[in-house]
Amino acid sequence: MLLWAAVGCLVSTAGYAQKIKGSDTCLPLTQQEAENYMARHPESRVTVTGGGSGVGISALQEGTTDIAMASRKIKFDERAKLVEKGKKPKEVVIAYDALAVVLHPSNPVTALTREQLEGIFTGKITNWKEVGGANLKIVAYSRETSSGTYEFFKESVLKNKNYKSGILSMPATGAIIQSVSQTPGAIGYVGLAYLNRDVKAAHVSYDGGRRYVEPSLAHAKDKTYPIVRPLFYYYEAANEAKVKPFIDYILSDEGQATVKKTGYIPVR
């Protein structure tokens, strides 16, 4: 999966070769949608690669991708740079995603409040015994600064406080899963679609511990799980005729069924 994501997934849109780049959160979904789309339009080809939301938007600015995948909204300066280059960026929400907090399976801690998560990732809480766990050093994993997931977690969970100095930054979501699964004191955060049996997802409370909610598609859809965000595609308006068939497919009933099947929340 990680190697495939790194080198790109060559699949094929109607009659066009297309490049899609950016968010690792969007990557598994876009790969699957592209495979399904190619099956319907074998004359087309789409190349899908990850790297992070910032990487995708930078590629859109430089004209090296047709669609930028992002797990956050485009920033003012990113939009301004596109406009400076004579490009008019357009935005579409293709799905929603929940962020799960993941722990090593051996960790006796099963639930954390937002305030505890803030303390852990800002460095104020350094040992699991401080949140009801064993006397074990906390090893916190994060995404890199170019990641939209990094920025969304900072905004939603840390309330825009800075991550602690020396936090272990991973280049891709899969690397967080792998690292947490191999480190008893570890904690990290990943998109819901990346959850597997190698890690344990913590229940999360945003009301001071009165109610803890398990990260799941059902809880994300009914809005009882608090860490949910939209997933975006950005493209240049002048390129709309080229990218619209693929985007329309993702927003169709068939495409949205794939959204749900792949572990994301449909837009409707």
Identify the role of each PLM range:
Residues 1-12:
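Bacterial N-terminal signal peptides
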Residues 16-268:
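Exported/periplasmic ABC-transporter solute-binding proteins
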